[in-house]
Amino acid sequence: MPSFYKLRKKIWKSLYLLIIVGMLYIGYILIKSGYINEKNDINVTKKNLNLRDNKNYDLKYNVILQDSIFEGVNKNLNAYKIKTERAIKESGNKYKLDIINAIYNINQDQALIITAKEGFLDQESNILDLKNDIKLFFDEIIFNTNNARINLVNQNIYGNSSAKLLYKNSSITSDSFNTMDENNIIIFKGNVSTIIDLSDY
């Protein structure tokens, strides 16, 4: 019995020794591989730092405003309000606009309603450029065009694309147009065609 006990004790000691040696070996391998990875990380970082020094990164970003409202007044202190589904700030106070609905008060009693699919607002110069399916509504007048520039301060509107003015059963079409005298005068230019139904007046 005592020899069996001694044999068992020797086996356990040998087993413990093997486990300790195995753990030391595994620890050595882990430390060695960690050192190699750390060395590689340092080299990669040095390379990245060198690349950063050699390149000038041009960081660009866009500020996108959803459901935005731009407000102001014209020279007669009549208010305007420009609502847009999306406005992308280009630079300073310049915005690219999508899906525009604007109310522009001509005077205290009359408002011009403007819709367009696209536009560009420069708040510094108070210019609103519109394009793509523009409609202007004023009392019973509907005005259609694809390109218009509105000076928000002096109220003048210019357009270099074909335009059509509808009033009840009457109409005027032209290649371009502009307004004067705070929109009291509309000048049609190029291939002007006028249809007047006297019953409208």
UniProtKB/Swiss-Prot annotation:
InterPro entries: LipoPS_assembly_LptC-rel
A cellular-component GO term for this protein: membrane
Keywords associated with the record: Membrane, Transmembrane, Transmembrane helix
Lipid bilayer topology: Single-pass membrane protein
Main location: membrane
Top-level taxon of the source organism: Bacteria
Transmembrane segments: 11-31
The name this protein goes by in its record: Uncharacterized protein RP506
